[in-house]
């Protein structure tokens, strides 16, 4: 896999940046690490009017993204449990806060399609998490 660290961020340009860049091909290769998928009919239902998102996009872009988000959710939950056990908070009924994903962009760029697609794919993750969409209007209300 071809991983490229981002531009150095220190004064002497020796330490790589905090992010990595992957080609679409390298990212798509990560799709094999998950079996989560949707069929064409479901994708048709999710897509917005005139939205170009293809099943190939789902496989090459959204499946690896879903798996990565799933890993973050799982390990965030494990950290919550371990922290509560260490701090002896389990007896106080501390509840885990939701894992929130924000999607931003200009008007009519596909934010709703991305949100619906992630909701569908994440809902098919191994632990079958509850996934809700909260629109800006619903959030502000």
What are these regions (language model features)?
Residues 125-141:
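Short beta-strand-centered segment that lines the nucleotide-binding/catalytic pocket of NTP-utilizing
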Residues 88-93, 106, 120-124, 138:
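Catalytic micro-motifs at enzyme active sites that drive phosphoryl/nucleotidyl and oxygen chemistry
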Residues 84-87, 100-106, 134-137:
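Short, glycine/charge-rich beta-strand/loop segments that flank catalytic centers
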Residues 101-120:
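Glycine-rich phosphate-binding P-loop
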Residues 2-11, 17-100:
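Extreme N-terminal, non-catalytic leader segments
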Residues 69-73, 118-126:
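Hydrophobic, Leu/Ile/Phe/Ala-enriched alpha-helical segments that form helix-helix packing faces
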């Amino acid at each position: 896999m071809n991983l490229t660290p981002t531009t150095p961020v220190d004064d002497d340009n020796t330490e790589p940046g905090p992010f990595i860049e992957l080609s679409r091909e390298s990212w798509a290769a990560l799709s094999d690490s998950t079996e989560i998928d949707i069929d064409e009919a479901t994708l048709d239902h999710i897509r917005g009017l005139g939205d170009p998102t293809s099943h190939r996009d789902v496989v090459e872009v959204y499946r690896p993204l879903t798996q990565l988000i799933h890993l973050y959710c799982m390990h965030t939950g494990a950290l919550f449990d371990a922290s509560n056990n260490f701090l002896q908070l389990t007896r106080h009924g501390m509840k885990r806060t939701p894992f929130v994903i924000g999607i931003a962009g200009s008007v009519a760029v596909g934010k709703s399609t991305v949100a619906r697609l992630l909701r569908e794919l994440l809902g098919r993750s191994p632990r079958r998490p509850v996934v809700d969409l909260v629109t800006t209007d619903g959030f502000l209300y």
